[in-house]
Each structure stands twice: as C-alpha cells, then as structure tokens.
C-alpha cells in the first residue's frame, strides 16, 4: 500500500499493515518523518498517549518509527503526492518529482496537509525569524535564563508558557482576549503560575512592533486592544503561536469529496468515496470525530483490516492479538 503522510498516524499505519503481512511505501513532502510533531513541536509534551503519563512529541515519533522499522517500509521523503492513476487493480501514485509508486491500496494520513505558521503582520519580522523569533520550539535550552514573550491564546501558547516558565528568566504571554482557548488543566496551571508571579499575562493586548538589530530582539512592542496604548517589553525571544496555515494540496483534486479541508470517510472502515482509498487521522472526518492521535491510531487499525479483507477476499483474516503474533526479526 501507499501511505500519504509520515506523521504519527502514518507511521502507525506502517506497523498495522505489517502486522497483517502488507508492505508499505510512505510518501511525505517533509525531509524527515514525524509531521508537525517533528517539525513544529518536537519538544512539546503530550499527555494523552495511553501508558505514557507524558512523552515528548519527538520521542513519540522516534518510538513509532522504531515500531515500524521491522516491516522495512520504503520512505519517499521530500516528495509530494500529486496524482493517482488507475491501472487495472493497481494505483500509481505520482509525486512532484515524477516518481511513481505502484500499489493496490492508498491510505491518506496527511494530517492538516501542507502547513506553515501564521506570521503576525509586523514590520521587519522576517529579519528576526530563526534567530530570535520562532514559530515552534525545537530546543528548550535556547531559552534558559532568557526573557521570553509568547503571543497567542491556544494550546501551544499556553503549553509553552507553562513549560518555559521553568527555565526562562521571564515569560510574558500576550493575548488579545481575556479568555484562553486551551485545555482546562493547562489553563489552571497557567493561571496558578501567573498568580505566583512566574508568568505575566497581558490581556487584552496584541503585538505592535519589534525592537532590536541584526536579527536579535531586545524588545517587543504591544498595544492595548481597548485603550490603544503601547508598551515595550524587554525581550530576547518572541514566540508567536497563531496556529498554522494548512492546505491539502493536490489531494483535494483526487475525487474524494473533500469538505473544508477534510475527507469524509465511513467511520467503521475509513473508506473514502473512492474504492481502495482510505483516510485516517486528522484529515479524516465523520460525525463525532475527535482530532486526537489515539483516535488516528484506532483508524489505522480499522483501515488496514478492511484493506486486507478487500485485497485478499479468499484468505480469511483470523483476528489475533499482537501477543499471539511473531514480530519479524
């Protein structure tokens, strides 16, 4: 099978396919496996993976790849899946580099599709990017003893404010609203740290400007939403967390009935509108869908079992728990 997307759910799909004796080729536009977890949030703690009270996104990706490795998947990294051609009982997935992957089934595990950060409209911000302005955290030690300004009101902003308060000299959180859109437990931690003076919450404010030279910040200008009064905060780093700009790209033109960047699927099988093309993870949608990694893992299992039944109708699949099967050496 061809798996479109090498994020956590795509990697787990390799494992599920391998456990059923099916081989996989994984196609991803990024140069490394892991998707957003590897590129945007490698040091972000994840708390809702069963049996792991907490794991870093980077470690989750590494473990999923190790779990898939015994099945010897082929990885086409740095390739964008552009076309799907039908040749009898086979598909040929053609990439932007004109490489064709011949397969009998396709599993789309594309997450949010291609992505990039939503950049705040500040003059000269590109001069500071990757030097003192970052849209994701790849190395927590960079911020040790530094003055950090975080902008945003969602999970990423709140999570990193809590985490960086343990290492930074100061953490200011800028949000244009009084309420935050993050997990209740994270919000409680954020408010508790603010009450103890370990984090300073500045609401309702928005970013207004940057101060510094040669790509290195020494201050961030913020503006009060109500009074329009501007204030300068001494800062070494700015972390704007305004979400990502995502698009499905060519997948949207594959005749899958895409709705608002999501692919409708049959919840029980993960089948799409096209025979032998499946979708799992965040890109897949049905009524009541929860966008959680563990839900994507479940969908991978459902899809792979259905694919086996479709491809090998004469070979009954006798369900076995993983402990009853032997892993390849």
From Swiss-Prot:
Q: Which UniProt keywords apply?
A: FAD, Flavoprotein, NADP, Oxidoreductase
Q: Which domain of life is it from?
A: Bacteria
Cofactor remark: Binds 1 FAD per subunit.
Q: Which cofactor does it need?
A: FAD
Q: Supply the enzyme class, top level.
A: oxidoreductase
Q: Where does FAD bind?
A: 28, 36, 41, 81, 115, 282, 323
Q: Does the keyword Flavoprotein apply?
A: yes
EC number of the protein:
1.18.1.2
Q: Which family does it belong to?
A: Belongs to the ferredoxin--NADP reductase type 2 family.
Q: How does it assemble?
A: Homodimer.
Protein known as: Ferredoxin--NADP reductase
Q: Which organism is it from?
A: Anaplasma marginale (strain St. Maries)
